[in-house]
Amino acid sequence: LKKCMDSIEEKSTYRNFEFIIVENNSTEEETFAYYKEIEKRDNVRVLYYKEDFNYSRINNFGAKEANGEYVLLLNNDTEMIEPDSIKEMLDVCMRPDVGIVGAKLIFEDNTIQHAGVIIGFGGVAGHAFIGQDRDDNGYFSRIISVQDLSAVTAACLMVRRSVFDEVEGLNEEFKVAFNDIDFCLKVRKAGYLVVYNPYAQFYHYESKSRGQEDSADKVARFQQEIGLFGERWGELLEHGDPYYNPNLTLDKADFSLKE
């Protein structure tokens, strides 16, 4: 969290923001010492969500407290790379036809973690170009191009507050997986565009903050969320992502041809 906040405070060219931190069952003493330190700042609030982990509910809880016209959902395991990132996202999000803007996210080893989401990857949905070099242009330069997509990850997602309220936030039935994709699809269904902007760039040290899907309970919950996604968006899964060529494979994220 400190690395995330420091990167924004030190680098961001856009300055008119507040931090809303949602604390959910941390146990480390240094975490609470850090909260005490940053709560002295005028633009920081720490909220305490004491129930079991539910990514959708936690984000809804925090967003309800936000004062701004735009809300940036941002995981604590991120770090700003490009100083203009927030400005870049805001420039696109201010368009009246846009509801959501996502960013280019980079793994610690300088490969791509997220350059948009494609519906159908791996049977449900997955990140485009994951694992490719951060400087690759990608298929038809899609890694480096601002473009409309079906979905982006909520690890770094800007949404207009009025649109967030219109679709009633994230669906809390999706506790961990697919909540961001469901949210983007709801926003598209309401008539707004979802846009990927690669000029906004963050590192994403993924799953460091929450662990992996490794227990029987977690696997069962994941399967349940796959089923729920299929119930809600089965027609889209059947017909395919409108932003993805049906001649390309769904088995890999590199936009290669079907075999």
Functional labels for PLM-detected ranges:
Residues 1-11:
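Short, well-formed alpha-helical segments that are part of the catalytic scaffolds
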Residues 99, 109-110, 121-148, 194, ...:
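C-terminal, non-catalytic tails of nucleotide-sugar-dependent glycosyltransferases
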Residues 49-66:
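Glycine-rich, basic loop-to-helix element that forms the pyrophosphate-binding segment
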Residues 71:
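Short aromatic/hydrophobic "clamp" motif used to bind/position activated sugar donors
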